[in-house]
Amino acid sequence: MTRDVRGIANFVLDSADRQSIGISNLGLNKIIYFLHSAFLHHFGEPLVSAKIEAWDYGPVFREVYHQFKRFGRSEITDRANKLNVFSGNYDRVNYEFDFETELFLNQQCNSLLRIPAGKLVDLSHMEDGAWHRARFQDGRVNPGVEITNELILTENPRGARH
C-alpha cells in the first residue's frame, strides 16, 4: 500500500517538531526521498506513489515542493493540505501506519533529521546513484526526469553509503 506523499511530509514535519528541528523544503524533499528509498529496499514496496523528479538540488516530489514553496529556504511552519471535494475546504493530510512501518519510519526519520540539508543533497547526488543516473542518462542533462523505483533499487540504501 502506497501513501500520499503529503502525509509523509506531515509525518516528517511532526517528527522534526518533536525534536525541535527546523526543516526547509529542500531538506524535507530529501528526507522523504531517503525514507522512500529505505522503505523500498527494506519492504520491497514503495512508500509513496508520487513521481520523484531529478531536479538540480536532488530528488523532488513536485506535490511537496509546491505545497511548501511559499517558505522559500526558511523553516516550514505549516502542514500539507488537500482539497476536500465534499466540503470545499482544505484539510490536513493525515498519516497512519501499522506498527512495523511506524517503527521503521521513526528510526529512519530520526536519523535523517540529524543530517543537514546540504549533506542530504550531497548524498542524493552520489555518482551512479539513482538521481545521478536519471539526471545524466544517455550522457546528457535531463532536468526533471523521473527517478523510478527500479533505479532506486539498483543503488545502495543510504545507510550503506556512510
PLM regions and their residue ranges:
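Domain-edge interaction signal
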Residues: M1-H162
